[in-house]
Amino acid sequence: MASKGGRDKIKLESTAGTGHFYTTTKNKRTKPEKMEIMKFDPVARKHVAYKETKIK
């Protein structure tokens, strides 16, 4: 039987306050810190920082 995968599902939420988010996976062993990445927010219609939050 295979072991559990090392990747967690995470939600990247916009810091612009629009409520828009992306979902992705992250390797929890190699990158234990919170992810922050610049991505396009279609509601704000510009590139903004997206911060990692847990999927509820």
Swiss-Prot record:
SUPFAM superfamilies: Zn-binding ribosomal proteins
Biased composition (Basic and acidic residues): 1-12
Highest taxon of source: Bacteria
Segments of skewed composition (Polar residues): 15-25
InterPro entries per record: Ribosomal_bL33 (IPR001705), Ribosomal_bL33_CS (IPR018264), Ribosomal_bL33_sf (IPR038584), Ribosomal_zn-bd (IPR011332)
Keywords: Ribonucleoprotein, Ribosomal protein
A Pfam family that the UniProt record links to this protein: Ribosomal_L33
GO cellular component: cytosolic large ribosomal subunit
GO biological process, one term: translation
Region (Disordered): 1-30
Molecular-function annotations in GO: structural constituent of ribosome
Family membership: Belongs to the bacterial ribosomal protein bL33 family.
Protein name, as recorded: Large ribosomal subunit protein bL33
Organism, as annotated: Ralstonia nicotianae (strain ATCC BAA-1114 / GMI1000)
